[in-house]
Amino acid sequence: MGADGILLAAAGQAWETNALELLAAAQRPVLKRCVDLTDLLASAATGQAAIAVLSEKLMGLDADAVIRLKRAEVRPIVVGEQDLTGIGITDFVPVDRIDELLGQIEASAPNTSVLDPEPPDVLPQTNASGRVVVVHGANGAPGRSLIGTTIAALRARDSPTVLLDLDPQAGSVAQSLGVLDEVSGLLAAARLANNGALDSPSFARCRRRINPGLDVLTGLPRSDRWMEVRAGAVPRILELSREVGDVVVDAGSSLEDDTDVSRSVGRNQTTIDAVAEADSIVLVGGAEPVGLSRLTRSLVGLREVTPVPVHVVINRMRDSLGWKRSDIQDLITTYAEPTTITFVPLDLAGVDRSMVQGKSLVEVGNSPILKALEPLLTLVFDPS
């Protein structure tokens, strides 16, 4: 293994300063001082590190986290007094003998250190050139992520599909599909891309298989981590995703260029990049007056920045509004002409079942939302 970097996750313990001094004196590179377990696992997934020096007090450290480290070929060394062999930790350094850390790092790792050497169970990379469908909506657009996951799950029944959570504000795809581990696929892939190391095998390690035809790249664990997705990362992620199959992107709500002189990208860059790479866009809005007002402004804005087809989805359509579909169509086309308009009915019971079970509406089944969205699939994925 060529990587020799060290990750440090000391959880604020006092021994961290001594450890840093020892490593600096030995000229052993510390790639990153990780703030939490999520940060550690995402950094390990980049393939740049060989060792992780951990505090026994690191929140969330368990057998699953240890397996993920070893799968990434990162050997964990715990500083502390607890016996953590039960979760797979075999290398320890007592706090009062922190000077032994270098010796433990230099010690040869046993052959059993990689517990899960098999390739990740995800869709294979092929010579395909899938289409990118970006699901977008203004602030407060109801059910944008639900529409995105449903479109992806419907498409996955017939064609390999990758669902990307690129929302820089409120990523929710992982939780809605029952992926509850703390590893961010987006952060792991972005760091690899930043280092020029994101290729087909490493991108496969960043994704999760949801069902036989659907992979997901989970989003940001917290909205303040958006700065770690640097310029060029999203286009590379989309390029590799196309090689797996069709791509559905759950994007953010704003296309405003919010960069400034202090940084190369703004928070909205993931959404801007996704729209720039899109083959078609699904614009989601609500059927009530506020939702329609926001939708029409977004539609006008999209028409100014991209020539690709924009398919409007009016979500949560219901009779209690007192409006006919033709009334809504006339209102929208007064401002800009979308490619198509699809009306999706309100189905609180079906959505509740989906969210509580951590499954897509396709898996839960029997929702009128599916029937409403199925005709849209042909329009966005097979327009010819």
Residue locations for each model-derived region?
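Acidic-aromatic/histidine active-site loop/patch
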Residues: 1-132, 181, 187, 191-197, ...
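Walker A/P-loop phosphate-binding motif and the immediately C-terminal alpha-helix
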Residues: 127-169, 173-176, 233, 240-241
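Phosphate-binding loop that captures ATP/GTP phosphates
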Residues: 155-216, 341
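Phosphate-binding/switch loop-helix module in NTP-utilizing enzymes
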Residues: 216-263, 271
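Inter-motif core of Ras-like GTPase G domains
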Residues: 242, 259-288
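Conserved C-terminal guanine-recognition region of P-loop GTPase G domains, centered on the G4
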Residues: 271, 294-306
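Beta-strand-loop-alpha "switch" segments that mediate conformational coupling across diverse proteins
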Residues: 316-322, 332-361
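NTP-binding/hydrolysis catalytic cores, primarily Walker-type P-loop NTPases
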Residues: 356-384
